[in-house]
Every structure is written in C-alpha cells, then in structure tokens.
Amino acid sequence: MTDVAQGLLDTSVIIDHDIVDADRLPAQAGISAVTLAELSAGPHTTADPAERSRRQDRLQWAAATFEPYPLDADAARAYGRVVAAVRASGRRERSRVADLLVAATAVANDLPLFTRNPDDLAHLGDVVEVHAV
C-alpha cells in the first residue's frame, strides 16, 4: 500500500481496478457519489451486450464495496475552487464536469485523489493532492 492512509479513487481507478497496482492505492479508499453516478450510466451507453454486462458487474462491485462520499454543500463550494484552478491554468471546465466534481468531493473531505488520468488533473495541484496510479 502507498504511504497515504486514506484517499478518494476517481472513476478511472474503479473502471481499471483489476489492472491497478493495489500497492499504489490507499489503505482506506473511498469513491464519490459522482463516480457511482458515472458507473450507473455506463451500462446504458454501450450497445455491446458483453460490455454492458462488464459495466454492470463493475457498478455492482463498486456499490457493494464502497460507501460513496456525497456531493454535498461542502463539495459544491469546493467545486468553485476547482473550477477557478482549471480556468487559471487556461483550460476549460465544461466538458469535464464529472471529473471536477469528483475532485471537489476530495477537496471537501480533505482527501488526496487517486487517478489513472493524472495529466487531466495536474493543474489542480494547489487545490487537491493528486496521485497517479
């Protein structure tokens, strides 16, 4: 396990959980309700029955494994800070709302964020601690 005791796993880590090195994850890991929402949408966004089944299995596993951190008022306020960091870096936030809401959930709960897409979140270094896995 990583030296970090607690952390929030973003959706990419949950999707790729089977291939992620467990030693790079925190001992106590959580997910955001936003991740659960993204996973819930997943089975409905593919026409391939085998892929739909895999996505449904991943959703059920995540729902049974994690108690999601809510997207509450603290996370909503933290989202403003996250968007400010995105804009300060010259990037646009519109197409990445779900990722940024997950990051805001990490900020609101004072947790580092673990992701498979660190380049997408590199500009948030002053707002949230990002760990690549």
Give the location of each predicted region.
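Short beta->alpha connector loops at strand-helix junctions that form conserved
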Residues: 117, 132-133
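C-terminal structural segments of small proteins and small subunits
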Residues: 108-120
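PIN-domain endoribonuclease scaffold, especially VapC-family toxins
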Residues: 2-8, 17-104, 122-132
